[in-house]
């Protein structure tokens, strides 16, 4: 099984990579950026594919199944991707896996839990022709029965605009960064790649601020077991003039507190829940929020896949198919090191 991430001529795609599995066993996974040295490289992962195939000493002609993380619903881009992948892997079946399904599979199946609640959430997932896109997924995972999706959030339709904490964090992080580093913000070449990096910086900045200095309405609401960021509909998103009254570090502290508070409230009130929790998606890398969930004592244990952001999609997409087709899966022993091993001699030669 192979999985790669990329889309033709799409500047909004990033973090391409490839993951190879053989007979239910993980062989190797790598991000294209590790080989091209271009941060968040979203081009077709030629080097990643060659890297993982070389480890198993097989060719592209020998790959049986290729999984691509993209909406399972057909779109013009979907068809273009399938055409290219069929050309690159002539004897392989081409399959698709939804963005947040891939995140969910990556974090749940690498966890030690037989059953767990799963939350995957980030800025955005798959986009659809009607200008809507995924923002999150809440599910219950069972290693014997699979993953049961409780809520799958589609942003842009009011009744489904839930789990979009990542969008809020991205938007306000962008404002904070533009105030702290105006020259850098003005020269951003790819705004989406910028959005990948800004939230982590603002999470760090929050430690220097004071949330109590900010007097703004709460960002999020909870309704029927779902949290959402309703600024699109009732203008709860603070305007720039409103935020301009405050120091960016205080806005960062307020934003982080809002983020943590709504997560703890959600897990406190959710009616469908398992004893343990798995987090995926870029928001799963918010260590302060994760600590707040742990401190609240709402779960026995929590697991976060190290590559919770989109660099782990190729890994999760492959697991999506492997979990359905193989009776047993052999996970890598160390989730922080998914590439191939190197001998002492190879390391010495590289250093020389």
PLM regions: where:
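Short acidic/glycine-rich loops and adjacent helix/strand connectors
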Residues: 1-352
């Amino acid at each position: 099984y192979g999985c790669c991430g990329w889309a033709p001529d799409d500047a909004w795609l990033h973090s391409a990579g490839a993951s190879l599995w053989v007979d239910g066993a993980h062989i190797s996974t790598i991000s294209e950026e590790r080989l091209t040295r271009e941060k968040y490289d979203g081009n077709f992962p030629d080097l990643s594919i060659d890297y993982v195939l070389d480890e198993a000493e097989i060719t592209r002609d020998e790959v049986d199944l290729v999984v691509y993380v993209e909406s399972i619903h057909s779109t013009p881009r979907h068809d273009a991707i399938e055409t290219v992948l069929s050309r690159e892997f002539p004897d392989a079946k081409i399959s698709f896996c939804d963005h947040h399904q891939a995140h969910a599979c990556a974090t749940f199946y690498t966890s030690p839990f037989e059953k767990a609640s799963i939350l995957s959430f980030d800025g955005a997932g798959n986009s659809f022709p009607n200008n809507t896109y995924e923002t999150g997924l809440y599910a219950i995972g069972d290693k014997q029965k699979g993953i049961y999706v409780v809520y799958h959030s589609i942003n842009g339709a009011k009744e489904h605009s839930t789990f979009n904490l990542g969008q809020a964090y991205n938007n306000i992080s962008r404002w904070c960064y533009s105030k702290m580093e105006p020259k850098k913000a003005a020269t951003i070449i790819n705004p989406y790649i910028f959005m990948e990096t800004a939230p982590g910086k603002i999470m760090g900045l929050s430690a220097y601020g004071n949330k109590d200095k900010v007097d703004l309405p709460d960002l999020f609401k909870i309704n029927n077991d779902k949290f959402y960021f309703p600024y699109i509909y009732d203008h709860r998103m603070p305007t720039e003039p409103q935020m301009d009254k405050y120091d960016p570090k205080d806005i960062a502290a307020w934003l982080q507190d809002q983020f943590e508070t709504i997560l703890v409230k959600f897990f406190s009130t959710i009616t469908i829940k398992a004893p343990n929790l798995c987090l995926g998606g870029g928001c799963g890398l918010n260590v302060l929020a994760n600590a707040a969930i742990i401190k609240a004592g709402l779960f026995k244990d929590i697991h976060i896949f190290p590559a919770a952001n989109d660099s782990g999609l190729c890994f999760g997409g492959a697991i999506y198919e492997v979990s359905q087709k193989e009776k047993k899966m052999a996970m890598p022993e160390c989730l922080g090191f998914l590439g191939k091993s190197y001998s002492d001699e190879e390391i010495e030669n590289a250093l020389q």
